[in-house]
């Protein structure tokens, strides 16, 4: 699973996910992409589950790029622990997703196969997505 190797700070504040994606909003590596329409957070497990679903569907053909990385630590307190006593331990990592962000890209497969693969991947993700094709001149 994806997670940062080193962090400057082990724990992070929650923050707010606002605005739209100004970076990473175009298909730049492959021919087809899966773009987020809504906002939310993807855990490392969800990113990996969607990748596996796509990889299994396209079999040996094509190439897949993951355009998001879970770099934000999420902490949780153990069960039946009273309030206070400091911030909990880091349990998993998430990637904050803004509308317009390209999550995955694919190349080397027919459009119909790419659509089907992205549909399977989208079913594993908690945010609404859409299929996009690379524009000429990008």
From Swiss-Prot:
**One GO cellular component term noted in the UniProt record for this chain:** cytosolic large ribosomal subunit
What's a Pfam family this protein contains?
Ribosomal_L16
Q: Which UniProt keywords apply?
A: Ribonucleoprotein, Ribosomal protein, RNA-binding, rRNA-binding, tRNA-binding
Gene Ontology annotations of biological process type: translation
GO molecular function per UniProt: rRNA binding; structural constituent of ribosome; tRNA binding
Q: Does rRNA-binding show up as a keyword for this record?
A: yes
Return the SUPFAM superfamilies for the record. Ribosomal protein L16p/L10e
Q: Which Gene3D superfamilies match?
A: Ribosomal protein L10e/L16 (3.90.1170.10)
Positions of disulphide bridges = none
Which InterPro entries does the record associate with it?
A: Ribosomal_uL16, Ribosomal_uL16_bact-type, Ribosomal_uL16_CS, Ribosomal_uL16_dom, Ribosomal_uL16_sf
Subunit record text: Part of the 50S ribosomal subunit.
What is the annotated role of this protein in its UniProt record? Binds 23S rRNA and is also seen to make contacts with the A and possibly P site tRNAs.
Family, per the entry?
Answer: Belongs to the universal ribosomal protein uL16 family.
Q: What is this protein called?
A: Large ribosomal subunit protein uL16
Give the species this sequence originates from.
Neisseria gonorrhoeae (strain ATCC 700825 / FA 1090)
What gene is this protein a product of? rplP
């Amino acid at each position: 699973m994806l997670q940062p190797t080193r962090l400057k700070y082990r724990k992070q504040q929650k923050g707010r996910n606002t605005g739209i994606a100004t970076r990473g909003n175009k298909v730049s590596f492959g021919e087809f992409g899966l773009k987020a329409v809504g906002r939310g957070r993807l855990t490392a497990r969800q990113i990996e589950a969607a990748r596996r679903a796509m990889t299994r569907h396209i079999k040996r053909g094509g190439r897949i790029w993951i355009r998001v990385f879970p770099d934000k630590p999420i902490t949780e307190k153990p069960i039946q622990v009273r309030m206070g006593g400091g911030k909990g331990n880091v349990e998993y990592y998430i990637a904050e997703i803004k509308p317009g962000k390209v999550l995955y890209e694919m190349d080397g497969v027919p459009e119909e196969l790419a659509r089907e693969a992205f549909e399977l991947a989208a079913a594993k993700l908690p945010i609404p997505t859409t299929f996009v094709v690379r524009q000429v001149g990008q």
